[in-house]
Amino acid sequence: MKDKIIVKGAKVHNLKNVSLEIPRDKLIVFTGLSGSGKSSLAFDTIYAEGQRRYVESLSSYARQFLGQMDKPDVESIEGLSPAISIDQKTTSRNPRSTVGTVTEIYDYLRLLYARVGVPHCPKCGKEITQQSVDQIVDQIMELPERSKIMILAPIIRGRKGTHEKVLENIKKQGFVRARIDGEIYDLTEDEIKLEKNIKHNIEAVVDRIIVKDGIEGRLTDSIETSLKMAEGLVLVNIIGEEDRLYSEHFACADCGISIDELAPRMFSFNSPFGKCERCDGLGTLMEIDEDLVVPNKDLSIRGGAISTWGDSRMKEESWTYCVLKALMEKYNFDLDTPYKDLPKKVQEVLMYGEPEKLKVTYTKENVTAVYNHSFEGEINNLRRRYMETNSDTMKAEIEKYMSDNPCPKCKGARLKPEALAVTVGGKNIFEFTSMAIREELDFINSINFSEKDKIISSQIIKEIQSRLSFLINVGLDYLDLARKAGTLSGGEAQRIRLATQIGSQLMGVLYILDEPSIGLHQRDNDRLISTLKQLRDVGNTLIVVEHDEDTMREADYIVDIGPGAGEHGGKIVASGTLDEIMSNENSLTGKYLTGAKKVELPEERRKGNGNFITVKGAKENNLKNVTAKFPLGTLTMVTGVSGSGKSTLVNEILYKGLNKIVNKAKDLPGKFKEITGYENIDKIIDIDQSPIGRTPRSNSATYTGTFDIIRELFSQTQEAKMRGYKPGRFSFNVKGGRCEACSGDGIIKIEMQFLSDVYVPCEVCKGKNIADVLNMTVEEALEFFENIPRIKNKLQTLMDVGLGYIRLGQPSTQLSGGEAQRIKLAYELSKRSTGKTLYILDEPTTGLHIHDVNRLVKILQRLVDGGNTVIVIEHNLDMIKCADYIVDLGPEGGDKGGTIIATGTPEKIAETKESYTGKYLKKYL
């Protein structure tokens, strides 16, 4: 077997005929500037070919159902294994996906609860047991000898009526006695008259026995008779003791509620046998939200407090106004009082209606009449219209005033009451999955099973323990299994898939990972690296596209790709061990690793402009009533270990809260008391890593508005004027402008069924969407348009953020998250600054080489120099050391986090003993 992977002549994207040898069964890091060609070599060449060869070994029938990779543009690759890629793009956004389902731990939990779970009555909470006749007989025979017992068949349990037919029926079956409401009656002699409106209990006396050896046969017959008469129930009355009730079904003898036999599907929120019927297993329901109906409670009703009422409904001749007039007379309020100052009762009536009919005086066409009208309230009105309408437009309009709320029936647990009434170790499956992963492992280890249950559950428990341990090892101990997969960051989702792969214990596989350290604090890096080594030691080859210094120092082999980005990259600058990279003169990475180059500390830390934005009483997720101050006019970093509450504080509370206050957005922020100081800013901009567009038609030129100016420019040319072309003629989205043969895509897709689809340039337009301009890189276009200031300024900002290598027409679907974020940053930089803007960024260093981080720091400093405020969630210490102010959260992740450990300059944080960030930051200052 070859001990090397040999790549010859790779020309994918910007790779310049790259040939490379890398050792097998080692941990290999691919590094280099953003856009240098790392992903093109790792994912689009090596992974694509490994995956393609594996899929080609399957039958043509099977290949139709599998995603077929394109054959990469490479002469040959030798020594390949089947390849598995773990990137950040494939996080499931399905609201039904949770951490538990993605890792498959939930499947094992369903099996555990179905096999050793203890069912309880969903109504009264009593334990429900299912027993055979033999088990019931054995329990009775354990009573002290000579015990006097009565076998009763409980036919009526707590039901009103005279029950004459029931008593007649007992008599017909040959039974002489019955116990009615605790009293024994002789059915042949006593005249029994029961009161109709009182609940009664009626039990037929099947047998009276003294417990002794040799009565088993008689006892079995009596119990079987009782079970038949009472539909699976038997009551044993022991003289001098409480009655014992036995059931041969899973049914509560007291409430009469029966549950199905326990099966794994009963615990699945995706199965009709397990999911809550009210919310369909989602755990949340879309409900009309009062905060969206009345977004600004400082306004009066006349001033537009109720956003669903337009101006026309406030005119005095309108029906709504006449109804309000009747309400004003009844409750004594006026339409000019701010909504928040109206009495609670009035607010309630306006939203949920008036139970009593109102006398409404209404004039139309000079005819005045008095109507008896019941006012249903705005929320009830919207809810009714939403339920009744068949119009998608109307539904979409009303949905603007709806938000996701926990389902009132299952309280967010997603399952039926019967499934939630089953416990293992005293916890139901939802309570178990809601704990942090580290607590789940402790809980599983602490359960005391009976000998029988121990044998049944041992294999299942082993699988659950190993999978939970892997998640803890990749630094995800703070997550819970009930967490929705769509709410995970790219790094978290990737590490979850990494843990799943370790759990599979495969060997001889080629794993290709894309920056697994994203979102991970330095403290947890060691655990991630040891996990990667564990995967290598089993006998796998790992290629990791990574910029993290610790990972590079621990790697067996490093490949540095460059020297620049885009057209200036695509070559192997250096490859070898850490020492070989550090001693290579051409390697930019080597210079940063030796310290010859570094991100410089700022000359001084800004104090800010004296104003602050303060979040008070933040309590969302794991935040423990936090009050955080953010100085305006500074570069502020929010730091802390993974899961400490950074994203919750900044994205869920600060951004959404300010967005609602300043921009009147409909975002629903997390729980907090108040935000102060917002009057000092006029814009809030969140620059995240979501795609700038989801179709090949969107690109950096359309997003930044450069394309509009270019089209305008084309329409000003002499030839265009002669032909009467307007800017729209140069759009690839508009008929008349676009090529109709390919609908403006520039390429035509030919489906090949079990082979991968082929894309060919359109023969009519030769793939030129608008001349050759869109095919230029930003760098080339900047030179081409240098005399046109409006275009030049926009392109210059793209250059400044390090995106000179991307083509203007490069589809947004081909851009990485980091590139999309920097295009947004460039777009913001190209706007005229007001000096009062708040920018929020979540890990902007994702996908960035240390050299790119250096460039990014300068751009952010430029924004702050213009008087703006930048708040960044960050783990990268080269970035953190350049901050003016730091808010450090912790001390741990999950329940053990959610408090502010320290605030102040990087130097102050480094001196704080409790701060993990400070501990690692020290050596960077």
Tell me the role of every PLM-derived stretch:
Residues 1-925:
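Conserved phosphate-binding elements of NTP-dependent enzyme cores
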